[in-house]
Amino acid sequence: MNGSFDSGGLRLQRHLTRPAGRPGATSGLILCHGFPFGPIDARQSGGTFPELIDRVSSELGWVAMTFTFRGCGGSEGDFSLQGWVDDLRAAIDHLIAETSPSGIWLVGTNTGGSIA
């Protein structure tokens, strides 16, 4: 399910998937995209991640979310490394508020993996 959450007054885009037929607390996963290598890449960062998140949720039975950091994709703001750290903290808070997972795994590619 597509949606958004706030990070430091900025609106960030996210994709959140809940496993079908799994009532109660499950593990959670947040997938973070890497650093964009130009304007086109910045608009498309994490573009295929929603499909991967849907698959993780379906196959593992976990709540799973991906989002675009500030300055990327449909998210507001401009890049800053500290901003990306703040964005991940806000994503964790959002996942907890929305789904109450039993625990959260943080994974990512490139810079997103380093921040996670």
Spell out what each predicted region is.
Residues 67-81:
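Glycine-rich "HGGG/HGxG" loop immediately N-terminal to the catalytic nucleophile
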Residues 48, 78-99:
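Alpha/beta-hydrolase active-site loop
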Residues 21-59:
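Short, surface-exposed "cap/lid" segments of acyl-processing enzymes
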Residues 115-116:
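Hydrolases whose catalytic domains are alpha/beta-hydrolase-1, hotdog thioesterase
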Residues 36, 71, 111:
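Short, glycine/serine-rich, charged loops/turns that create anion-binding
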Residues 99-110:
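Alpha/beta-hydrolase fold nucleophile elbow
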